[in-house]
Curated annotation (Swiss-Prot):
Residues 1-20 are annotated as: Disordered. Belongs to the Tlp family. Transmembrane segments: none annotated. It comes from Caldanaerobacter subterraneus subsp. tengcongensis (strain DSM 15242 / JCM 11007 / NBRC 100824 / MB4) (Thermoanaerobacter tengcongensis). InterPro entries: SASP_thioredoxin-like. Pfam families: Tlp. NCBIfam families: SASP_tlp (TIGR03090). This is Protein Tlp homolog. It comes from the Bacteria.
């Protein structure tokens, strides 16, 4: 693909029709990862260094924040759909 060809392509239209479904799937996957990490800690905590334990706990804290943000995004998307 040449430079000219790359810059003459039109941008894809903004299709938000499946955003809620995508967000729900992302929430599901994030919750699953959270639970797997919790289970891993329960089973292997004595084998892990304090740094590794803290790293896993920090990831899970970040996952909880992400879940909250994605849930808010779903609410925003639903409100946006209602306005259309």
């Amino acid at each position: 693909m040449g430079k000219e060809e790359r810059y003459t392509k039109k941008p894809k239209p903004d299709d938000r029709s499946d955003n809620v479904e995508k967000l729900q799937e992302m929430i599901h996957n994030t919750i699953e990862n959270y639970r797997e990490a919790e289970d891993y800690l329960k089973l292997h905590a004595e084998e892990l260094s304090p740094e590794e334990i803290e790293r896993i706990k920090e990831k899970n804290r970040n996952r909880l924040i992400s879940i909250q943000n994605m849930r808010q995004e779903i609410i925003d998307e639903v409100h946006d759909r209602e306005r259309r």
